[in-house]
């Protein structure tokens, strides 16, 4: 029979950037088929296993000599763009793109252990005297997000654990009620050695305290047997975004004021992909998967810091198509 397939082309950037990257770029090295298996129940009650495959084929302007020959100035036009756009459109990088909010973000696996010049680090044992915070953004049809944070003696925050209520599809929630969400949060804290037995300060979206339509979400979560308590977070959006920028900045020793355990996969997946709102250019586009961002923002606003002195991070190794290293982020 006829082989049916689809070819799709795109450039990095835009609101769909994160979806394309998660589906085609991140799961496997370039040129490696990604196969998914599906089960279909037939009318006679039997089940049939079906497969779908996809593959990412990297390409850049250098693969189109005809275009370069017809328009010799095109290469110079791409090279003259701002750094983020140049990396995306000239070199095909999916880790840096126009409109990216947190251009400071860096994820360098080679530095996970020494914790320098990277925001993602290897997990470590949290000292008993460190304060623990729990951030929460409620969701039903959209994901709910819970993040646990440890604060060291210098005020540096570490995201040490997360609970993200999604189906496995980006931005699709589990549709579970507040009581069940509270049960899962309490269970996570009781079963994790980093959290068990600690005093945890919960900070949440102030909307969960709304009683205009009956019992509030906060009250439901505080009931027996979960006894989960929250304080309303500061929801000032632009000030919260600036706290992100302040904390992501590296000092002269390569240490930021905010780092993330590499086990927090959904934070690492969603935060670098956030883009600006075209209508409100100082804020992020809220149509994105921004639930982790919101939940983290409440915790940062509970622990505000002053604007730091900016220090430039060292350049990453040149690997624009990610052929040898699967995680690199440019700081603009």
Task: Show the residue positions of the predicted features.
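ASCE P-loop NTPase helicase motor core
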Residues: 1-64
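A short acidic (Asp/Glu
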Residues: 18-19, 143-147, 210-217
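ATPase catalytic-site recognition across NTP-hydrolyzing enzymes
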Residues: 64-136
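Gly/Thr-rich phosphate-binding beta-strand-loop-beta motif of the actin/hexokinase/Hsp70
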Residues: 127-151
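Mg2+-dependent endonuclease catalytic cores in nucleic-acid-processing enzymes, primarily RNase H-like
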Residues: 155-288, 304-311, 315-332
